[in-house]
Amino acid sequence: MTVVVLGCKIHGDRPSRMLHARLEAAAEFLLEHPQSHCIVTGGQGADEDYPEAYVMKNYLVDKGISPMRIVTESRSTSTLENITFSAEMAEIYNCHERFLIVTDRFHQYRAMRTANDLGIVSYALNVETAWYLAMPYWFREMAAITRDWITS
């Protein structure tokens, strides 16, 4: 199984609270499953100093995950690109074709649906988000799901 950690906002060279939770969940899984590889996926936002994927990889390495197990995908700017580019990286690096997608519960439906639409067998590793952080993102997700439904 290839662990795919979806990117999220960073602050300088540190993950945001939400990204921190995703990375903690991924690190725990990777430490318990040493045969699994990981793809960290996330580009660089206009207000970010680095691509999210670089910060994510550094965090996991600091947690004891070998850098040889981590593939960095730093071009993506959307959920669709996260999954699409991760699938490309999995093929290039001969990672397992099944994905364990690590993201917040509010984001998991769209991430899993995207993977399914691309023909990728995937499983969810949900991360809980504090309600006061999650509320605006739930509305954003509903808008994104509606947009995807209209444009598909």
What are these regions (language model features)?
Residues M1-W138:
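A structural signal for short, hydrophobic/glycine-enriched beta-strand patches
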Residues A134-S152:
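A transmembrane-helix-recognition feature enriched in membrane-embedded lipid enzymes
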